Amino acid sequence: FMVIYRADSMQLIKRFADPKKKAIYVEKTTDEAAKLFGINSNAVGYVVSDDEPDAKLYSVFKNMKNKKTTAVAADIFESYGTIRFINMFPLVIKAMQTGGTLVVDEFDASIHPMALMSIINVFHNDDVNIHHAQLIFNTHNPIFLNSNLFRRDEIKFVERDDDTHDSVLYALSDFGTTGDKGVRKHEDYMSKYFISQYGAIKDIDFTPIFEEILCDEKEG
């Protein structure tokens, strides 16, 4: 198992066996994936400095006129979501190569859903996922409640009791396929979720808080 807690704050630390100081190491696979994702630079690579043993992620720019290359720290130039994707992608590759199970908390934080859907589809593709790697993640985004992405038994919900703070885990397939709450294969899961068909949804209304604050300001 590879477990990523708080994927939104994950940082990948790269080390090289015999690094050259100030050299830029561009990993072909990660760089190609980053370009598909949509980086703002010409490439991404890792730089080892004199005072830091760990390689740092840099955005690489190439001047087409004088052929010179400039590297800028990626956290200055790239978006937070782009850096998260670049940090996570090598772990996806490792899982696919070893047939491992990748468990990710907040898998979709700051990353475009289309990129994540592509990764999910790769895990589902038996022609690509030849070692039968598995992906398990949690999310607050209902866009993944999609029959084209997951089987009913692959979609899980967590229902929390506000009084006891106990949580119950159950699958979409637990509802069966018949009756008023039955779930059929090609239904619109997301729409049904928003009308509380499956539970695990909370009605949140901050209006009273704002009304109280603004009312106090008005009276003051």
Model-derived features: positions:
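GG-anchored amphipathic helix commonly corresponding to the ABC/SMC/Rad50 NBD signature/C-loop
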Residues: 74-102, 118
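Phosphate-coordinating catalytic segments in nucleotide- and nucleic-acid-processing enzymes
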Residues: 1-86, 192, 207-210, 217-220
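Surface-exposed alpha-helical segments enriched in charged/polar residues
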Residues: 32, 93, 121-124
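C-terminal lobe/lid and adjacent interdomain/linker elements of RecA-like ASCE P-loop ATPase modules
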Residues: 61, 118-220
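Short, well-ordered loop/turn elements at secondary-structure boundaries
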Residues: 37-40, 97-98, 151
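Walker B catalytic acidic pair
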Residues: 105-107
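Conserved D-loop-proximal element of ABC-family nucleotide-binding domains
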Residues: 112-113
